[in-house]
Amino acid sequence: MKHQLRLYQREAFRFLKRNGSSGFFVEMRMGKTLVMIRLLRRMRRPILVVAPGSAIGSWIDDLVDEEQPYTTLLGSRAQRLKTLATGLAFGRGWFLINKEGHRALPELANVSWGAVILDESHFIKNPKAKVTKFYTKNFRDVPYRYVLTGTPNPESRLDMVTQFIFTHGHCCGFTNYWSFEHAMTTSFDGYTKKLKKTAREAMVSFVSRNAYVLDRASAGMDVEKVIRTRYIEMPPKVRKAYDKLEKDFVLELGDVYESHLWRMSQYAALRSLCSGVLPSQEEGGGWLWDGKVRELLDLLEGELAEQQVVVWFSFIQPMRLVAANLAKEKISCTYIDGSVPMVERFERIRKFNAGGARVILVQERVGESGIKLAAADTAVYFTEPPGLVTKQQSEDRILLVEKQSILLIPFVVPNTVEHDIHKALGMKKREALTFLNEAMRRRALRGSK
């Protein structure tokens, strides 16, 4: 064992050892993985870890450091079955699989696991999702079940219900999500569900007893996140087309006429216009308007001159166009998106962290977990993701405990869906932190008695 556990890690270790199946809700880069490995390293039965594909590498690094045997269940169904059988022949060790892996390998549910760990466990927050049903209906005989995440309630406090049904078989005494929702929530508009006041109290108490909750500030490891939002106006012609699309579900701009009758299609088209490209734009097309890329170039050649920077994108087309603009200005850059093979992604990340590229462009879905881009102290959001989990995960890609602060620069087009997303992210973050801080306070009070 090379690394000594920090004080808060030792406290978490004792909590998890005493409580058994638990939630482990601490922020990223605080060593959740190491605590779990130390906790379960003497287990004689196999241990299953389910994590985002991009986070599996971090587990492997820590398992190697701790000299623990591991097996990765990746590849085709035939390959996974063979690897699982070979690994189980040894009777113990760690088995790592991506969060979609159950579709190719449902036999996971039939293995006599000693422990099952869901890393970034908010992937089972939706009670209707097949992945949620798979993990909450199976593994009931596994003696130790854990959910790990820094954001257990990214959109709502209800996000935690199915996570605790996985770990404990119930949440506040309710064994399924729908009975919990019926008894514990109310709705003012017939659609949005909110916890009743008494239910909120019960939920805070339940979480404080059944999860270890800690943020960086409470652990003395806080890194200040400095946010400097840049508001960038559309040109009048594009603004007029945007407003018509928002009102009439039709995009009319020059020779372009597109109908977006479905809400999701309209929403995607509105976001695309905000990023500077047409919704239906094919590979090789240019900018519809270039306000954001000009702002980015001004920053890279001005305030951020000589600095390494991460730039986040929701859409691939503007990312490719930005790469071309940077090349034209002789600013060294690399990029990772879904088209880049996994091995090549890590090579490009290594190159960036080694100083071989000044800028790295990242598609949010590819880079939201498991990668480290700590060579940069600044992240620019060409488009902000609508989900709090993705936003916080992306922020933490450049975070190191040793840093005093990091700079986050969202690009926002005023009075658009982008502006709505920007404001909603702030509200979601405040709501999530308020609840978890109360759970932390309760646990601290219990511990002092």
Model-inferred region functions:
Residues 1-3, 17-21, 29-30, 35-44, ...:
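Conserved Helicase C-terminal RecA-like lobe
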Residues 28-29, 142-157:
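Conserved helicase ATPase motor motifs in RecA-like P-loop NTPase domains
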Residues 35, 44-65, 154-159, 315-316:
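Conserved Walker A/P-loop ATP-binding site and its immediately adjacent core
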Residues 73-82, 98-104, 125-128, 313-317, ...:
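Conserved helicase motor
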Residues 55-78, 167-171:
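Conserved helix-turn-beta segment of the N-terminal RecA-like "Helicase ATP-binding" lobe
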Residues 386-449:
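A conserved SF2-helicase RecA2
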Residues 96-101, 106-112, 130-143, 173-285, ...:
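Inter-lobe coupling linker of SF2 helicases/translocases
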Residues 33, 102-107, 155-157, 319-323, ...:
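SF2 helicase motor core recognition
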